[in-house]
Amino acid sequence: MTKFVFVTGGVVSSIGKGIVAASLGCLFKSRNYSVSILKLDPYINVDPGTMSPYQHGEVFVTDDGAETDLDLGHYERFTDTPMSRLNSVTTGSIYQAVLNKERRGAYMGGTVQVIPHITNEIKERIHRVARNTNPDIVITEIGGTVGDIESLPFLEAIRQFRKDVGRNNVLYMHVTLIPWIPAAREMKTKPTQHSVKELRSIGIQPDVLVCRCDRPLKEGMKEKLSEFCDVPVESVITAQDASSIYEVPLVVEKEGLAQQTLELLHLEPRKPDLSQWQTLIQRMQAPKRHIEVALVGKYVQLSDAYLSVVESLVHAGIATDSEVKLRWVSAEDIENYGADKYLNDVSGIIVPGGFGIRGVDGKVRAIEYARKEKIPFLGLCLGMQCAVIEWGRNVAGLNSANSAEFEPETTNPVINLLPEQQDVVDLGGTMRLGLYPCRITPDTLAASLYRQEVIYERHRHRYEFNNAYRNSLLETGYKVSGTSPDGRLVEIIEFSDHPFFIATQFHPEFKSRPNCAHPLFLGFVKAAIEQTKSD
């Protein structure tokens, strides 16, 4: 039977529940247990697809086209297991499902209430993951902080879950903060005690405490937490701050987190194989070189808006024994002060995705600078569209070249709305989303990087290259190096007279892994290394 681990968080938000859940999944997989990880988000949006990156951070896209929380990216990267729309649940999606059932008469005229209807729907979503993927263990992260009113239906649902499936099949894990108080020169357990008290008042007794702290948790402190929180001392786990999130699995493995969890779930405590993980950490901690690349974006004030891009560069750095330093550059600053001020000494320029006209001219200028100065360039989604706009304006002589998204009446819409998007009215979940095949053109940079004839990448867009301009593009030194299998949609472009200039309509960052860097990011970082040598 599938076992269930529920991860809650206390004291403060952004405590790191997602990294703890992902790390636990990594440790289970290292013991040959199959794992699926589910995120329950308490916000009323149906999904984060229409939320501002400043509000929510990155929207992570799964193979099946779900727009999900960025934590699903951590789950995939740490466990090397693809997630799906089943792994992302919000309060909004729960209420939507319940209200749809009510409209269909599924409740036979009964009064629809939070208990049992909402809680039953939540439990059904957890069971659905177990049924559809049949893992040994389902880890469920409950978003928010214990004590928040928004999380109460989820907490009530997981309280009931232990009774439904049996005590030995469920484990409650609480991630909490043990702060260091400089004035007192000691760590304090009181916030954790109160957080556990709040959880117990709901009817949930945590089995394991994962204690976030910036220094080691002394044995006496663990015993105190054990005493006041009614948790065995061996189940009080120190999760000390690490220099990289990829160190966390090794940190909590040393503390015995996976071993203790498996024992409490009555599963065989197998010996882990973490050799590959240890090797990548060693390579990360001892880079042979340092390079700096610029990320020119619209949302650079919040790095989480580009989380998968950042992590993909980390992965490529590991693969090349390099530390990739990021220079965050606002596209609007380039509009105001010029590209040279921000980009003249970087070894690579990456322009990621985004929506809306703000900052687009700055991105176009950054791409022009990369092209003219022969600086390695990688464009992603909107980054490719901006590369096409830059080509139109500065290479093809189409001064009015633009995207129909930004200027619907432009006389040169080099980027146009996909035909299937013409009659779409709703914004949420209606883009070209998820995994699609792409045929690679032989004898191109893309072909040398992928070394495959057909690849599969994840998309999230409404607009696409306008084929009316394809011949003009090809006549000016550019190549279409990737298309949809029928040749209709342009998915990759590159510029031949350049050390490394490639842009994609899809989002390769969603498929990069710490132990398997994505070919495009790997090629980009290698080109940036060569650029550093030439400088």
Curated annotation (Swiss-Prot):
One of its GO terms (cellular component) is cytosol. Keywords: ATP-binding, Glutamine amidotransferase, Ligase, Magnesium, Metal-binding, Nucleotide-binding, Pyrimidine biosynthesis. It is an enzyme of class 6 (ligase). L-glutamine binds at Y54, G354, L382, G383, M384, Q385, E405, R462. UTP binds at S13, K188, T189, K190, P191, T192, Q193, K224. It catalyses: UTP + L-glutamine + ATP + H2O = CTP + L-glutamate + ADP + phosphate + 2 H(+); L-glutamine + H2O = L-glutamate + NH4(+); UTP + NH4(+) + ATP = CTP + ADP + phosphate + 2 H(+). The active site is at C381, H507, E509. InterPro entries: Class_I_gatase-like, CTP_synthase, CTP_synthase_N, GATASE, GATase1_CTP_Synthase, P-loop_NTPase. GO terms for biological process: 'de novo' CTP biosynthetic process; pyrimidine nucleobase biosynthetic process. One of its GO terms (molecular function) is CTP synthase activity. CTP binds at S13, D148, I149, E150, K188, T189, K190, P191, T192, Q193, K224. Residues 292-534 form the Glutamine amidotransferase type-1 domain. Pathway: Pyrimidine metabolism; CTP biosynthesis via de novo pathway; CTP from UDP: step 2/2. Its EC number is 6.3.4.2. Residues 1-267 are annotated as: Amidoligase domain. Allosterically activated by GTP, when glutamine is the substrate; GTP has no effect on the reaction when ammonia is the substrate. The allosteric effector GTP functions by stabilizing the protein conformation that binds the tetrahedral intermediate(s) formed during glutamine hydrolysis. Inhibited by the product CTP, via allosteric rather than competitive inhibition. CDD domains: CTPS_N, GATase1_CTP_Synthase. Mg(2+) binds at D71, E141. ATP binds at S14, I15, G16, K17, G18, I19, D71. Homotetramer. Catalyzes the ATP-dependent amination of UTP to CTP with either L-glutamine or ammonia as the source of nitrogen. Regulates intracellular CTP levels through interactions with the four ribonucleotide triphosphates. CTPSs have evolved a hybrid strategy for distinguishing between UTP and CTP. The overlapping regions of the product feedback inhibitory and substrate sites recognize a common feature in both compounds, the triphosphate moiety. To differentiate isosteric substrate and product pyrimidine rings, an additional pocket far from the expected kinase/ligase catalytic site, specifically recognizes the cytosine and ribose portions of the product inhibitor. Belongs to the CTP synthase family. This is CTP synthase. The gene is pyrG.
